[in-house]
C-alpha cells in the first residue's frame, strides 16, 4: 500500500483513514486531467526559476503527458491507500523517475493544487454548459418565430386571463436564458483567476513566478492575495452553483409548463411519442416522464447553493477539511444540468402546438381586455369600458372577433426576437473561452 505524502513514522488508523478520505478517490477522478495540466504548468515555472533542470523538466513533462493520455482513455485510477489525485500523480512520477518525481511538489501544497484543479475543471464545464444553453436558446427562438402568429391562452392564478401566443411562450424562455448566461459569465470570470502559488494559503519562500503559470494556464489574472486565494474555496463553488441553479430554475419552469400544457385538460402542446413512457396498467397513457425527471433534477440543482453554503458556513480564514465534502455535491452537478439541457433541447425542437386551441368556447372571455381597450381607444373612459364589458359578460352578451392588436415591444405582434438574439450573442462573445483552450493545447503540445 502506498505511503501518504505526509506520512512519517506513525501509521494511520484504518477507520480514521476511511472516514477522512471518504469519497475523495471517486470525486478526484473528475479532476485528474486538470491536475496533470496544473502540474505541467507548475514544473515549467519551476525550471524557469532553477528548481528543475531542463532535462528533469523534459522527463516530467513526458510522463505527465502519458498520465494525461491514460486519463483520456479512462484507464487512470487512484489506488487503494492513495488519498487523492495529487498523491496518485506524484506516486506515479516517483515510481517512474525516482528522485526527479519527488521534486514536483516544490513550492506547492495540495491546498492550492486542488483549488487550481477545481478552477480548471469548472471553467471547462462552464464552457460546455454555455454551449448547451446556447443550443437550447436557438431552438426556442426558432420555435418562437415559427409560431409567432398562433394564439394561446395566457393564465394568471391558473385562471384564464388574456391572449398570449406560442411565439411569446417560446421567446420568454429564450430571454430568460440570456439572463441565466449572465450569471454563468460572472461565475466564469471568478473562476478564471489563478490560485497557484498560494500554496497552503500563505505563499512560499521559493521565488515562484505566478504570472508565468497564469499565462501558461490561460487564466485572465491572478488571485493575488494568497490568503484570499484559499478563502475563495467554497465561495467559488457556491457562486458557480448559483449560476447553475439559475439555469435549472428556467428549465424546471419550462418542464412544468410542458407537462401541464401537454395534459388533456389543457391540450396546448403535444410531446413527441418517443419522449413519453407508458403505464403498466393503463394502455392509453403517454406520460411526460422526461420532463417530470427534468423538473425534479433541476429542483435538486436549485438546492445546490444552499448545500454548499451550509458546508462552508462559519469557517474562518485558512484551509479546512470541511471543504472536501463540497466536491460530492458540486462535481456531479454539471453533468446533471447538461443532461437536462440536452433533453429539453431535443423535445423543444420536436414539440407540436395546437394551432386551434382558442376555438374552444371556454376561452371567449380571454378577449375581454381587448374589448375594453377597443372602447377606450374610441373615447370611453377606461373604467367605464371595464364596467361595461364586465356587465356584458354577466348578462351573457359578450362577443369578440378573437383578433388581437398588440404592437409594442415584446408583445404578441412585436416579439423582438432579433433584439433578444443580439443580447445573447453579446453575452456569448463576452466569455472568451479561446484563451483557456489555446493554453491547454500548448501545454499538451497539440
From Swiss-Prot:
GO terms for cellular component: cytosol. It comes from the Bacteria. InterPro entries: Argininosuccinate_lyase, Fumarase/histidase_N, Fumarate_lyase_CS, Fumarate_lyase_fam, Fumarate_lyase_N, L-Aspartase-like. Pathway: Amino-acid biosynthesis; L-arginine biosynthesis; L-arginine from L-ornithine and carbamoyl phosphate: step 3/3. Disulfide bonds: none annotated. Belongs to the lyase 1 family. Argininosuccinate lyase subfamily. One of its GO terms (molecular function) is argininosuccinate lyase activity. It catalyses: 2-(N(omega)-L-arginino)succinate = fumarate + L-arginine. Keywords: Amino-acid biosynthesis, Arginine biosynthesis, Cytoplasm, Lyase. Its EC number is 4.3.2.1. GO terms for biological process: arginine biosynthetic process via ornithine; L-arginine biosynthetic process. Gene3D superfamilies: Fumarase/aspartase (C-terminal domain), Fumarase/aspartase (Central domain), Fumarase/aspartase (N-terminal domain). Transmembrane segments: none annotated. This is Argininosuccinate lyase. It is found in: Cytoplasm. It comes from Bacteroides thetaiotaomicron (strain ATCC 29148 / DSM 2079 / JCM 5827 / CCUG 10774 / NCTC 10582 / VPI-5482 / E50).
